[in-house]
């Protein structure tokens, strides 16, 4: 299976980042290591059908079975019981990661309503990028009829970048549409 983003990384992105940042070794060049997708269920966590629908939606979107995250201990103030489902998470690496990135950049982000670009302030101090999508219907795999309620999720792109600037340049080289400040 062809992976255009992986080939683009090797042929275009690595030489550009070496020239921009003056890396001495090819292994110093930052790369994307994994993508984590999380959805918290909130009050709907007690509803088993909502949990099953969320698992199925995330599985369809990512191509990988998600893990249900459970509460570690009871907290009465939040009406939370131990081992109660809180949400779902999935970690994508290698082939599935590049496949998801390709669809995210080329199909999903252009379909987001009133999209002006991703916020460049979503980077942490280590060059990882976090952002959220408000609606699962922007993914072409999800049909409108199968959705009972619109729910968003968080996407974390973990990189080996050491700084925010390196992470920003890496993702911008991949084609992420960031807002102009």
Swiss-Prot record:
PROSITE patterns: RIBOSOMAL_L5 (PS00358). Keywords: Chloroplast, Plastid, Ribonucleoprotein, Ribosomal protein, RNA-binding, rRNA-binding. The keyword Oxidoreductase does not apply. It comes from the Eukaryota. This is Large ribosomal subunit protein uL5c. Binds 5S rRNA, forms part of the central protuberance of the 50S subunit. Its main location: plastid. Part of the 50S ribosomal subunit; contacts the 5S rRNA. The keyword Ribosomal protein applies. HAMAP family: Ribosomal_uL5_B. One of its GO terms (biological process) is translation. It is found in: Plastid, Chloroplast. GO terms for molecular function: rRNA binding; structural constituent of ribosome. GO terms for cellular component: chloroplast; ribonucleoprotein complex; ribosome. Belongs to the universal ribosomal protein uL5 family.
